[in-house]
Regions:
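Bacterial N-terminal signal peptides that target proteins for export
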Residues: 2-16
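C-terminal motif of bacterial Sec signal peptides marking the signal peptidase cleavage site
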Residues: 25-28
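Bacterial signal peptide processing site
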Residues: 30-32
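Extracytoplasmic
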Residues: 35, 65, 75-78, 85, ...
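Bilobed "Venus flytrap"/periplasmic-binding protein-like clamshell domains
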Residues: 35-68, 122-190, 299, 303, ...
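Acidic, polar ligand-binding/catalytic clefts
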Residues: 88-122, 132, 201-204
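Pocket-lining segment of extracytoplasmic ligand-binding domains
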Residues: 95-97, 105-106, 133, 170-262, ...
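Segments of small-molecule ligand-sensing domains
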Residues: 252-323
């Protein structure tokens, strides 16, 4: 493991210890109080967020009799805005967007008060091109038609950061397209764009479907982890996409970043407890929806940097005695 990797794990371990020590027991929580409504902001159909959100909503309808819906969105940035406005109750959000939201930095105009219920799986940034494309590295995108993800998505924010780290201005040096995953995959298949960015779990269903229609490659991006960490903190890590994921020619290094299940910080403790409990009770259903859900676990779940674990969620983890 690299020095950066060891350093990152040490920070993660200290964060877990900090949560365990600092968050006090909630003797008055009184157990779960399931809400009557659970609107879950997720992302594009064809992405992992959407698959997991659909399974969680179905579990809430079945177990609670709640009015629960999987809300299709542009993903992380829009999810935070919907959550802050009270239009949804819970959201799946990538950690770098959470950091920007709580700090009130672009694309947010002011700090947003959030808390986390659980850390979920990791996203992998996937820069997809056709197998016969001349694009071999990020800088080969100059002048080409590239989808950087839906507007107001975590994909767009991170794609822009990676492009800037590579010396490319996404507004000047690319023919930028802002497409959802389904639109972008279809455009690449038809030759209407030259590449697409998407940040998601593995395999991303929409990319797997595209790979079944034509040979594709992923462009290596791992070299940009260091400048991203230098510019934006320790949220990013080096990850590899196995060749078997999409029948790729070889394993590809890329940028990884965690995902969190988040709520407004003022959510009632008993409601936060109930939603966290539902997440783990319904985990078999989530795994059936997408295998990345098997990565959800109590040990890593409390490591919700860069935002605090909600006290109600902390109480759930204590009650299950695996904290």
């Amino acid at each position: 493991m690299s020095d950066q990797g060891r350093c990152g794990w040490r920070r993660l371990a200290w964060w877990v210890v900090l949560v365990a020590v600092v968050v006090p027991p909630l003797g008055g929580c009184g157990g779960p109080d399931p809400p009557d409504r659970l609107l879950i902001a997720t992302g594009n159909p064809g992405g992992v967020y959407y698959a997991l959100g659909g399974a969680l909503a179905e579990a809430a309808r079945r177990d609670w009799g709640a009015r629960a819906e999987n809300v299709e969105t542009a993903a992380s940035v829009e999810n935070v805005r919907l959550l802050a406005a009270g239009e949804v109750d819970v959201a799946i959000v990538v950690a770098d967007v959470v950091a920007a939201a709580v700090d009130g930095t672009p694309p947010f105009d002011a700090p947003v008060r959030l808390a986390a219920l659980c850390r979920l799986h990791d996203d992998y940034v996937q820069l997809v091109v056709r197998d016969d494309s001349p694009v071999q590295q990020l800088t080969d995108l100059r002048g080409l038609r590239v989808s950087t993800g839906s507007h107001n998505s975590g994909t767009e924010m991170l794609a822009d950061r990676i492009l800037l780290a590579g010396g490319l201005d996404p507004e000047v040096d690319l023919q930028r397209r802002r497409l959802g995953l389904g639109e972008a995959a279809e455009a690449l298949r038809r030759g209407r764009i030259d590449g697409l960015f998407f940040s998601g779990g593995l395999p991303t269903p929409g990319i797997a479907e595209l790979a079944g229609q034509l040979p594709i490659r992923l462009v290596p991006l791992a070299e940009y982890v260091r400048p991203l960490r230098g510019g934006y903190g320790q949220l990013y890590s080096e990850r590899s996409v196995p060749a078997t994921t999409y029948r790729l020619p070889a394993e590809v290094g890329t940028v990884g970043v965690g995902n969190l299940l988040v709520v407004r910080a003022d959510l009632a403790d008993r409601t936060a407890y109930a939603i966290t409990k539902l997440l783990f009770d319904a985990q078999p259903d989530l795994v059936s929806a997408h295998r990345e859900a098997h990565r959800i676990n109590r040990q890593a779940g409390v490591a919700t940097f860069p935002v605090s674990l909600h006290p109600g969620a902390a109480d759930y983890f204590r009650d299950t005695k695996r904290f």
